[in-house]
Amino acid sequence: MGGGDKVKILKAIFAAASAVCYLNSAILPESDWSKKDLKGEVKSMTATEYEYSIDGSGALENTRVKRTEFNENGYIVQETEHINGAPNSSVLFEYGKDGLIRKKYQDSAVYLYEYEFDGENLVATAKEQHVEDKFYPRMEKITYGKDGKMIARTVYSGGTLVTDDSYVYDEKGVLTRIENNMEPRHGIEISFERKPNGEYEKITQAPNSKWVYYYAANGDEMEYTSVNYFGSEAKIWQILQFKDISRDERGNLTRKTSVKFKPADKYYENGDIIKIGLYKKMEIKYEYYAK
């Protein structure tokens, strides 16, 4: 091989490496700040949730404390949850210099991440490590579009495909449909109904269920209703109304209380409702990165 050929090969290698670096910098998954609709550069958030008896007696049953820590790019580096003071779950992420997750420790499992490009999309593959039984290692593959939003997700358990979903967004980047590619009939449709005063409803519709979220013009959640369908009958499963909502100076939620109701007629979706009692209280504290 002549010297000129070697130079050409080296140039090709450097060009390929530069292209990969460029794509890495151009495509990053949507930040967790964005997913959680957080305002400002949140360093950590600690959410304390008080869960009360479902009978409406007001008796406190559980206290959940979830602490989430973010890096300066808005991605979660660690999240832990305690229930009544006892550890319940934990996840820890390690990132590379390119800003992408390289390793995840989730409870007792460890995942290593690899990345490739499918056209203009970024594909992340997380493989579970140190699994003795070859039939149970888990592998998850997520595809991100140019805007960083997840557009496809597949999950394998021991080599068997168990999840195959596609995510569809409108022109504003709002999720409108989750397609179940394994069971097309089980897809989820998401729609919005907006009122002239700025209030709106978010309706999530599955084949046998519906979840309706009611929001004030400022984005505060006012009410939530879940409905299950049995043939032609619609049975209300749960109704929650929210009060005592407050936000900090950046606009992030700091307090919310939910009260549970039930319909006077369990098969009548828009009828009168009866108050059961206190359901949950949420308090959230934030730390921010210094500007």
What are these regions (language model features)?
Residues 15-22:
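Bacterial N-terminal signal peptides
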Residues 25-291:
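Buried hydrophobic residues that stabilize the cores of well-folded domains
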Residues 8-15:
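Sec-dependent signal peptide recognition
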